[in-house]
A protein has these predicted regions:
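A short acidic, Gly/Pro-enriched loop at the edge of an enzyme's catalytic core
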Residues: 130-141
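Conserved class I S-adenosyl-L-methionine
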Residues: 61-70
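Conserved Class I S-adenosyl-L-methionine
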Residues: 112, 187-213
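Class I SAM-dependent methyltransferase Rossmann-like catalytic core
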Residues: 27-55
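S-adenosyl-L-methionine
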Residues: 100-130
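Conserved beta-strand signature within the Rossmann-like core of class I S-adenosyl-L-methionine
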Residues: 172-180
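A short glycine-rich, Lys/Arg-flanked "PGG" loop and its adjoining helix->strand segment in the class I
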Residues: 79-80, 156-171
Length: 248
């Protein structure tokens, strides 16, 4: 009787693993087969979207959020990954949408024009006032923006932001943070970078658990002393990738 029960458990476990693997394969295929803007594809070499999505465990049909979506590079990647049965929230604060004379607002509007990416919902609102129910999102991610919160507004604001993300996630949900690596003694505000040790400290002080960190976007040739928009660095900076999890 015990042997039969153990065999059943092993089979069930194998089925779940297979479903997860096939689900991830479908997600990667969705992205690779998608008709995406040429400008986005040029950035793929440095951003490795399929590798990142696979690392984060995004599944078809998931409800996800691109936090501080800017012009929507990752919004589009996520939209193709989760498929027609999924939902992507593209969040930008009103202040961010006014930046550079409305550049991000115009770029995101163009990206979603004529019903492109029908599974994307714009949230032109602050994280503290999203207007959606709490505990309803499977995964949220923010890419190359977290440094702006910490460098401009400080530790308390960064922790408050993380708490806002925590609130919108389902139990067991994932929060991914990608950013340009800075140094402890560098002018990270001017360089648009984030000291990795500081990020780890913020994670430790937040409600999240550190689930994993990835080396997919690391570049040892970047010594962290140059601005991220410098021609020889732009699109190819050394970047950390953290996968945080809200406890179940």
């Amino acid at each position: 009787m015990e042997i039969n029960r153990m065999s059943t458990l092993r089979i069930a476990s194998s089925v779940l693993v297979a479903l997860a693997v096939f689900g991830q394969a479908d997600v990667v295929t969705n992205i690779r087969d998608a008709t995406r803007p040429d400008a986005d594809k040029v950035r793929d070499a440095g951003r490795k979207p399929t590798d990142v999505i696979h690392f984060l465990g995004v599944q078809e049909g998931a409800i996800v959020m691109d936090v501080m979506a800017s012009s929507g590079y990752y919004t589009e990647v996520l939209a193709h990954a989760v498929g027609s049965q999924g939902t992507v929230y593209a969040q930008n604060s009103p202040m961010m949408l006014k930046y550079r004379y409305g550049f991000y607002d115009k770029a995101l509007t163009q990206r979603l024009k004529d019903g492109r990416l029908a599974n994307v919902v714009r949230l032109d609102r602050d994280m503290s006032d999203l207007g959606i129910p709490s505990g309803t999102v499977d995964l949220a991610m923010t890419a190359l923006n977290f440094h702006d919160i910490y460098n401009s507004a400080g530790e308390a604001a960064a922790l408050e932001f993380m708490s806002d993300v925590y609130g919108v996630l389902k139990p067991g949900g994932v929060f991914a943070v990608i950013d340009h690596v800075g140094s402890a003694d560098g002018d990270n505000n001017r360089l648009h970078r984030m000291d990795e040790a500081v990020m780890r400290e913020l994670i430790a002080r937040s409600e999240f658990q550190l689930d994993a960190s990835g080396d997919l976007l690391r570049n040892p040739k970047d010594d962290h002393t140059g601005g991220v928009f410098a021609p020889d660095l732009r699109g190819n900076t050394d970047r950390f990738l953290f996968r945080l999890r809200k406890p179940k």
